[in-house]
């Protein structure tokens, strides 16, 4: 791997093939308390396929994998204490793909232990697509996250 970063985002270059278009390159969230959110995401992201990390205690923390990267920063002090709402303009939720139902179930068992909260326990959501199996949970700021498995 080269020591340069890609695109000025602070994320390291990837050796994985990157399609020229499509997909999501990165997600960047602002959080109320970066020190509180770091341990949650440090436990979560490797389990979701983002094993690389860029977190030396600075103003941002990031994780990356073959599918892109996920970043956190301290929210601007003008918005201190603001709460997340999936119904406001902006982000509704972030959903990650699971390899299996077992991965969904395991995360659901463990998410509270690293500072998250289960919003909806694992179950099938046939109203979405057949076989859609997911858990919905929140990070320490209440940002809605999802882990979903859909059989091939």
Describe the residue ranges of each PLM region.
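A short acidic/small-residue loop/turn micro-motif
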Residues: 126-127, 150-152
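Short glycine-/small-residue motifs
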Residues: 144-147
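Glycine-centered tight beta-turn/hairpin loop motif at sheet-sheet or coil-to-beta transitions
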Residues: 67, 140-142
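A generic structural-conservation signal
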Residues: 54-55, 120-121, 151
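Core segments of cupin and vicinal oxygen chelate
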Residues: 28-76
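Vicinal oxygen chelate
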Residues: 31-36, 94-140
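N-terminal beta-strand motif that seeds the catalytic metal site of vicinal oxygen chelate
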Residues: 2-38, 94, 151-152
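Long, continuous compositionally biased terminal/linker segments
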Residues: 11-13, 17-18, 61, 65-106
């Amino acid at each position: 791997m080269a020591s340069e970063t890609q695109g000025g985002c602070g994320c390291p270059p990837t050796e994985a093939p990157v399609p020229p278009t499509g997909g999501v390159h990165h997600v960047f969230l602002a959080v109320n308390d970066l020190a509180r959110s770091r341990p949650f995401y440090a436990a979560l992201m490797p389990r979701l396929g983002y094993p690389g990390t860029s977190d030396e205690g600075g103003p941002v923390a990031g994780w990356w994998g073959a599918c892109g990267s996920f970043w956190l920063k301290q929210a601007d002090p003008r918005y201190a204490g603001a709460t997340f709402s999936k119904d406001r303009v902006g982000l509704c939720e972030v959903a990650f793909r699971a390899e299996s139902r077992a991965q969904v179930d395991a995360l659901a068992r463990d998410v509270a232990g690293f500072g998250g909260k289960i919003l909806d326990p694992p179950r099938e959501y046939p109203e979405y697509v057949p076989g859609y199996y997911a858990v919905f949970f929140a990070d320490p700021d209440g940002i809605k996250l999802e882990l979903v498995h859909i059989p091939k």
